[in-house]
């Protein structure tokens, strides 16, 4: 093999890692956030979820991340699951949906990074004569009793803190 081919072979793992890290949604780095101010990272309306974070100023746990329900009346069409239980990966059919980066205003060398994964589901909706998708309560109850509940998409998120901590 020529040196050129060896060089290209050496680059393959780096290219594969970059391709695996490319999320479905592209976004710039967020605005720097102050310590002890809770901010919304992203809303996922179909899961009735809002991702929130707070820089704490604590070296042991510099960032607090929570998934909050948007409203008690919201009817989710997707499910938000625990990342550690789901262990999402492309091999399991999950897609890296979003990477959210938020720098700390108090420590510019540090940023919170939230990776949001999505497990898509093929949902074929049957349309009626008016072109509308309708759910009839009695039919839905019968299907649920028979264990024929349709799958719904799932989301999972993992937060890490990257960069160097400030003194």
Predicted regions and their residues:
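Bacterial N-terminal signal peptides that target proteins for export
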Residues: 1-8
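Hydrophobic h-region of N-terminal signal peptides that target proteins for export
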Residues: 10-19
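Ser/Thr-rich low-complexity repeats and stalk/linker segments
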Residues: 21-167
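A ubiquitous, low-specificity "background" feature that marks scattered single residues
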Residues: 8-11, 46
């Amino acid at each position: 093999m020529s040196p050129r081919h060896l060089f290209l072979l050496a680059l393959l793992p780096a290219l594969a890692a970059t391709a695996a890290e490319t999320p479905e949604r592209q976004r710039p780095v967020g605005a720097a956030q102050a310590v002890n101010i809770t901010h919304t990272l992203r809303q996922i309306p179909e899961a009735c979820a809002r991702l929130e974070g707070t820089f704490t100023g604590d070296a042991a746990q510099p960032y607090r991340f929570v998934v909050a329900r948007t409203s008690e009346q919201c009817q989710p069409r997707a499910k938000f699951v625990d990342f550690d239980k789901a262990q999402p990966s492309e091999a399991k059919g999950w897609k890296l949906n979003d990477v959210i980066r938020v720098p700390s205003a108090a420590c510019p060398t540090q940023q919170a990074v939230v990776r949001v994964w999505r497990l898509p589901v093929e949902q074929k909706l049957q349309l009626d004569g008016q072109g509308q998708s309708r759910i009839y309560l009695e039919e839905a109850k019968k299907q649920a009793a028979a264990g024929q509940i349709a799958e719904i998409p799932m989301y999972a998120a993992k937060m890490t803190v990257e960069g160097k901590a400030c003194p």
